[in-house]
Design a protein with these regions (language model features):
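Fe-S-dependent hydro-lyases/dehydratases of central metabolism
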Residues: 1-180
């Protein structure tokens, strides 16, 4: 087995058998996908009293669901970066931050071109929080719905989720708590 070039061998690492996650990193963060994973898969559960988070038209691709483009300063992800003292010039893109689930779930449904029929006249990742009727970013609504214990669904039109096999389109939706 190759040990790699000299530069590779000079990289300083912890001598551990398990990766030591850097809690301060905004690029790579330990994902929650395997936390509390049951030994056996859970069966299907009935979804009751769910609210739609988005009602989308036709041709909403994985690029709409999980954008790879620039991160807006005035967004839930921008707020997350401000909390972590990251300057806007260093936000980079969603594509470069795929190793951080906190960034990626905030970016889910945040494509600047996505149109949610629940929030007419808006573009770019907004929804309407019910029963208040307040228009807000999708992630912010999810936080409120989680506090209330509200099940969420997304209603997609023809060819919803088609496109490149971007894993974050599925993972981000799951992390937001969308049931169907």
């Amino acid at each position: 087995i190759s040990e790699g070039p000299k530069q590779w061998q000079e990289i300083k690492t912890d001598n551990t058998s398990i990766y030591n996650w850097d809690a301060k990193s905004t690029y790579v963060k330990k994902p929650p996908f395997f936390d509390n994973l049951p030994d056996e898969p859970e069966g299907f559960k009935e979804i009751k009293d769910a609210r739609p988070l988005l009602i989308l038209g036709d041709m909403v691709t994985t690029d709409h669901i999980s954008p790879a483009g620039n991160i807006e300063k005035e967004s839930p992800t921008g707020n997350y970066f401000m909390e972590h003292q990251i300057l806007p010039k260093n936000y980079n893109s969603y594509g470069s931050r795929r190793g951080n689930h906190e960034v990626m779930m905030r970016g889910t449904f945040a494509n600047i071109r996505i149109k949610n029929e629940m929030a007419p006249g808006t573009e770019g990742g907004f929804t309407k929080l019910y029963p208040e009727g307040k228009v807000m970013p999708v992630y912010d609504a999810v936080v409120e719905y989680k506090k209330r214990g509200t099940n969420l669904i997304v209603i997609g039109g023809k060819e919803y989720g088609t496109g490149s096999s971007r894993d974050w389109a599925a993972k981000g939706t799951k992390l937001l708590g969308v049931k169907a």
